[in-house]
Amino acid sequence: MSSIKFHEKSLKEVTRWIQANEDINTETSLSSSSDSSTTIPVIDHLPARIPYATDLKRNPCHFQKCLISRLATTKMLSHAVDGGDIEVMGMLVGYTSNDMIVVKDCYSLPVQGTETRVNAHMESYEYMVQYLDAFVTKEDKIVGWYHSHPGYGCWLSNIDIQTQSLNQNYQDPYLAIVVDPKKSLSGNTLDIGAFRTLPSKDNNEHVDYYPLNIQLYQNSLDVNISKLKLKFKVDPAIQNNPNEPELMKELHECVENWFHAKKVMKSTVGFNAIGSTVVNETEIGNEDFTHERSNSISSTSSLTTRHTTDVEMDDQESAQSSLDIPANVIPGMQFQEAEIKHEYELKKKKLLLLKVKQYQKLRTYRQLFNASE
């Protein structure tokens, strides 16, 4: 998963939010700025890096401020909008300065979310470490995580509190940011909250949390974000196809049907082989019984006499018939196998075409951003 998905829908909605924040005062309960100007302040020189001292950990409310870059808020909101009604999750990158946590950037995680919760698995942690080693400078580090609450405000649920408390105790300083994409888009104001947990008292399972004062900032390069989005228009022919998840699901079903058909054919052939063996043993027993009876009772007719060579020939014919049975596949199985294979190839070609279009889209964005420099 890429660190940010610039889908056309997300671009338009995020651009609308940026324009609204440039024209309207951003004094809200969660994202209020001490600056009286109506624009996001431009800060090219960030506060000095001051590590989190060990003696300061005794104060659970040491951190009171959170400085978030415009780049990070844009990526978080774009990721949350792209998730729709499903919660999304990502990591925050930055550093600390006295009682302030500075969030310079963020990146999304490949997690499985629902409408009410999001869970990170082992693959997500591996991706987090690999991304950190490849794209984040040594001066910066992970300072927290973010996730979305689509339509139900910015706060920490019980699971969020447990997650934040665990990470805060293990790798403090650690911050939790919650973004509500639906309220942000409907109100044209970024609905965001930053929180930290408080230690429990008397080993009580109930853990409380407190909000941090949020201030947004941008540098001189961030000012051109809106202009780049409004200036260049992506060809609709290379937009992302919303049917990609459904296509991946259908491709997976084709593979499952293929293995299921193979399994059914194998089990049926084995059953036929077992049945033929039972029939063969029964025939041999009957022939032995007839042979013994012909030896004990004298017969005047040679037609009723069975020779040992006849029994051996019968055994060979029975064994030959038992070997021929597995070659007879289930009626219609060959047609079903060919149909599944054809459907699989068709879905694979469609998915390949989608990936080619996405690659063309990424190349287009790269050319646009390089041309603007």
From Swiss-Prot:
Single GO term (MF): metallopeptidase activity
MPN domain sequence ranges: 66-201
Enzyme class: hydrolase
InterPro entries to which the protein is assigned, alphabetical: JAMM/MPN+_dom, JAMM_MPN+_peptidase_M67A, MPN
EC numbers on record: 3.4.-.-
Cellular component terms per the entry's GO annotation: COP9 signalosome; cytoplasm
Motif segment (JAMM motif): 147-160
Sequence ranges of Low complexity compositional bias: 295-306
Compartment annotation: Cytoplasm; Nucleus
Family to which this protein belongs: Belongs to the peptidase M67A family. CSN5 subfamily.
Main function: Catalytic Component of the COP9 signalosome (CSN) complex that acts as an regulator of the ubiquitin (Ubl) conjugation pathway by mediating the deneddylation of the cullin subunit of SCF-type E3 ubiquitin-protein ligase complexes. The CNS complex is involved in the regulation of the mating pheromone response.
Domain writeup: The JAMM motif is essential for the protease activity of the CSN complex resulting in deneddylation of cullins. It constitutes the catalytic center of the complex.
Protein name (database record): COP9 signalosome complex subunit 5
